[in-house]
UniProtKB/Swiss-Prot annotation:
Residue numbers of Phosphoserine PTMs: S79, S94, S96
GO terms under cellular component: host cell; host cell nucleus; host extracellular space; virion component
Species: Human immunodeficiency virus type 1 group M subtype B (isolate NY5) (HIV-1)
Taxonomic lineage of the native organism: Viruses, Riboviria, Pararnavirae, Artverviricota, Revtraviricetes
Ranges for region Homooligomerization: 1-42
Family from the record: Belongs to the HIV-1 VPR protein family.
Biological role: During virus replication, may deplete host UNG protein, and incude G2-M cell cycle arrest. Acts by targeting specific host proteins for degradation by the 26S proteasome, through association with the cellular CUL4A-DDB1 E3 ligase complex by direct interaction with host VPRPB/DCAF-1. Cell cycle arrest reportedly occurs within hours of infection and is not blocked by antiviral agents, suggesting that it is initiated by the VPR carried into the virion. Additionally, VPR induces apoptosis in a cell cycle dependent manner suggesting that these two effects are mechanistically linked.
Protein name: Protein Vpr
Length: 96
């Protein structure tokens, strides 16, 4: 008779701990790229819409991920993601 395999994978964090850690990482990255007032207003909007719920946490994570992805894709000056490589002249010769 077949049996289900034992769970041999790594121990996982509880969903809520992982979600809160992800939110903190996204917030710390977002403050490097967007004005704080924008982020504050986004937080206010999420709070007014969802209140203090997990749905609000998931919504702000989704929005911050989308904002950061688009920001990097367009070409953030802090990142090389989305920036096409340009050849530079050698020996210091440049055109201005």
């Amino acid at each position: 008779m077949e049996q289900a395999p034992e769970d041999q994978g790594p121990q996982r964090e509880p969903y809520n701990e992982w979600t809160l850690e992800l939110l903190e990482e996204l917030k710390s990255e977002a403050v490097r790229h967007f004005p704080r007032i924008w982020l504050h207003n986004l937080g206010q909007h999420i709070y007014e819409t969802y209140g203090d719920t997990w749905a609000g946490v998931e919504a702000i994570i989704r929005i911050l991920q989308q904002l950061l992805f688009i920001h990097f894709r367009i070409g953030c000056r802090h990142s090389r993601i989305g920036v096409t490589r340009q050849r530079r002249a050698r020996n210091g010769a440049s055109r201005s």
